[in-house]
């Protein structure tokens, strides 16, 4: 779907900061507030903006640190439905945060979040690898998140400029 | 210690300290200042550029380069100018890499001025122009831009020309007004330069940062390459102020003259910065696009906010400044800036430091995060309320 420059601009602003107010969006794009609201409605209706979420650094919240694993999954695609059916069987589990179809050495990349390594291990061995079309899984645990979806978790935000300059 | 005669040069003695300095001193000691007074990008230099400079150090590129700069960099500059601005310079003889646009302006003026030669300086403008003309032995003749949008009136320019006039200095997009001159306006200035046989020193350092129309370089105007000294650099567009890297382009005769001054006074621009500049031109464009988009949004936000506050503000075509009028407050630029700083801790620069016609305006840089701009606007709103007549 083709977007106008201003619609694209709004998508880009919200992708960086979904809490930007409609008034500020309007000012930044030189639209009126009601025009901005119309654009937002359109973007939401078309599922171009799918959801407004926050990036949370769970590692800072005691008792909620959790673990994330990326799992390479090899599967046998099914006649007629290809990878879509098995992908659906996997992404419906609530533990599963992302599922991507990949080129290369394996087929699906599955990201799982759980409370503990044990919990993830249990999910992989009991749910994932027992699915009919799954041939093999390789699990990688994430040790530390430095940057996630374009956001650096501990950015150096100090302004090093002098306060007034020509 | 003082000698009987006094040891300072008369020219230097007579230079006024920049009005910006006072505000710097005032703001520096304060806590919690939201600064709209900064004349440089709020972005850090793109990582790919910083990384290339680190690599150049690791590999030991720590010696002088050719006086005019690394040939590879000059070639890249030539390609960049052709591609983006449709102007052609020979990298071997018409481009000099300098220590910022600042030094480019300096060697340009020193190469063309004899004592008492006059240079028309269109104000409001960057604070260095007139002092650099004086230091080069010339006489700066200020010509005031028109308050309505800060464009240049051809009639005023014509009226200021004397037999001693050697050059016109322009800057588009402009610091402090953000005003960009379009092709037609450049053509009018070009016509004057041709009829009175003048050079044009065109400071195009903000050419990357334009938001509405595409950019036209003075050197791209028909017949103007021969009488234009094009000044530019990496500071603003590529967020590289601290690297001190700029360049100057001019026809061979002028370039070779400037190269003499450059060779004796500077030798060459910093080598590490030159390697960084090379990377910026080769691989920095995507980040420049991102920065430009971000500036455009903030410009729109600032223009709309100031107009809503009742401080009339034209929408500037480029750079990262807005220049709202504060005349409705009944305060002078200096009073407005000083009281705003003391009462609300928002730093802006009074317009009069950029020339007489800047009185009644303040320069607000939007090279700050949107959160800071929002906070600044909030404080200015409160300030205006407290100062309602
Ligand atoms: C109009 C103008 N010209 C030149 C310069 C100096 O730039 P550089 O950092 O390349 O010396 C500035 C910096 O503020 C400027 O605003």
Locations of the language-model features?
Chain A
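A compositional/biophysical signature of low hydrophobicity enriched in polar/charged and small residues
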Residues: 1-166
């Amino acid at each position: 779907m083709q977007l106008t420059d201003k619609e694209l601009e709004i998508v880009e602003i919200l992708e960086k900061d979904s809490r930007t107010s409609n008034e500020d969006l309007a000012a930044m794009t030189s639209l009126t507030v009601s025009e901005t609201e119309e654009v937002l409605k359109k973007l939401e209706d078309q599922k171009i903006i799918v959801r407004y979420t926050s990036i949370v650094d769970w590692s800072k919240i005691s008792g909620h640190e959790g673990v994330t694993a990326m799992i390479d999954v090899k599967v046998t695609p099914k006649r007629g439905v290809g990878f879509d059916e098995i992908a659906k069987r996997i992404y419906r589990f609530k533990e599963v945060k992302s599922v991507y179809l990949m080129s290369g050495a394996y087929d699906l990349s599955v990201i799982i979040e759980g409370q503990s390594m044990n919990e993830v291990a249990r999910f992989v061995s009991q749910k994932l690898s027992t699915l009919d079309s799954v041939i093999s899984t390789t699990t990688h645990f994430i040790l530390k998140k430095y940057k996630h979806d374009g956001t650096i978790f501990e950015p150096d935000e100090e302004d090093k400029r002098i306060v007034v300059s020509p | 210690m003082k000698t009987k005669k006094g040891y300072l040069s008369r020219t230097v003695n007579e230079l006024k300290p920049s009005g910006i300095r006072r505000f710097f001193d005032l703001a520096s000691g304060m806590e919690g200042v939201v600064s709209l007074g900064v004349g440089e990008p709020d972005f850090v230099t793109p990582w790919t550029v910083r990384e290339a400079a680190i690599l150049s150090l690791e590999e030991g590129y720590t010696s002088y380069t050719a006086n005019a700069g690394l040939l590879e960099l000059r070639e890249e500059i030539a390609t960049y100018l052709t591609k983006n601005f449709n102007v052609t310079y020979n990298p071997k003889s018409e481009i000099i890499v300098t220590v910022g646009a600042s030094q480019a302006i300096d060697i340009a003026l020193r190469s063309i001025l004899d004592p008492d030669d006059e240079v028309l300086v269109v104000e409001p403008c960057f604070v260095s122009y007139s002092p650099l003309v004086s230091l080069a032995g010339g006489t700066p003749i200020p010509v005031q831009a028109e308050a309505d949008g800060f464009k240049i009136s051809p009639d005023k320019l014509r009226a200021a020309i004397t037999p001693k006039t050697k050059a016109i200095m322009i800057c588009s997009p402009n610091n402090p007004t953000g005003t960009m001159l379009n092709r037609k306006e450049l053509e009018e200035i070009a016509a004057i330069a041709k009829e009175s046989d003048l050079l044009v020193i065109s400071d195009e350092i903000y050419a990357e940062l334009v938001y509405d129309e595409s950019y036209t370089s003075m050197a791209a105007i028909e017949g103007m390459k021969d009488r234009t000294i094009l000044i530019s650099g990496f500071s603003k567009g590529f967020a590289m102020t601290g690297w001190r890297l700029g360049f100057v382009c001019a026809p061979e005769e002028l370039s070779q003259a400037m190269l003499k001054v450059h060779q004796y006074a500077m030798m060459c621009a910093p080598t590490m910065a030159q390697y960084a500049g090379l990377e910026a031109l080769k691989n920095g464009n995507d980040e420049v696009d991102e920065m430009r988009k971000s500036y455009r949004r903030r410009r729109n936000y600032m223009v709309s906010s100031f107009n809503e506050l009742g401080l009339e503000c034209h929408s500037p075509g480029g750079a990262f400044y807005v220049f709202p009028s504060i005349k409705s407050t009944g305060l002078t630029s200096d009073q407005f800036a000083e009281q705003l700083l003391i009462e609300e801790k928002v730093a802006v620069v009074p317009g009069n430091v950029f020339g007489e016609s800047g009185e009644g305006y303040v320069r607000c840089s939007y090279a700050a995060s949107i959160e800071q701009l929002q906070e600044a606007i909030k404080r200015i709103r409160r300030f205006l309320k407290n100062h309602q007549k």
